[in-house]
Amino acid sequence: MLLDTYLTNEESASARVFRVYRETPAHYHVGSDEYLYVLSGRGTFWMGDSSNGAEFAAGDLLFFKRRVVHALPQIIEGPVVFLAIDTPRRDPKDIVFVNPEEGTPESFIRDRQLY
């Protein structure tokens, strides 16, 4: 992730724009629901289990309820740019990886930087 710009950051909800350049491993959020509106790009996602996958593209809305495991295993056409709305506002450290070897909140952000 290179760009992560907050448009609004209220306690009840936050809205931000961010870009994804690489796959995102299976994870979930404990404290908030996540809505991702696809502004550009194309990829695949799954939620619940990895056999339940689908493709997404610009104009699609993805919704991940809190504590539901989800992933973006493939970026087909990138970068993918999302408008993300988290309800309530999500703490940036609220990301739990199913496989702890795939990262921490800090390493996830750091390792996805382009530079």
Predicted regions span which residues?
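A short glycine-rich, His/Asp/Glu-containing loop-to-beta-strand
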Residues: 1-26, 32, 85
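Short hydrophobic/aromatic-rich beta-strand segments that constitute the beta-sheet cores
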Residues: 4, 17, 45-47, 72, ...
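Double-stranded beta-helix
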Residues: 8-11, 73-115
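Conserved hydrophobic/aromatic beta-strand scaffold that supports enzyme active sites
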Residues: 15-19, 35, 53, 61-63, ...
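A generic "binding-loop/recognition-motif" signal
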Residues: 22, 31, 52, 68-69, ...
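Short histidine-centered beta-strand/loop micro-motifs
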Residues: 25-30, 47, 54-55, 73-75
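A short beta-strand-loop-beta hairpin characteristic of the jelly-roll/cupin
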Residues: 35-58, 68, 95-97
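Conserved metal-binding segment of the jelly-roll/cupin
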Residues: 56-76, 85-87
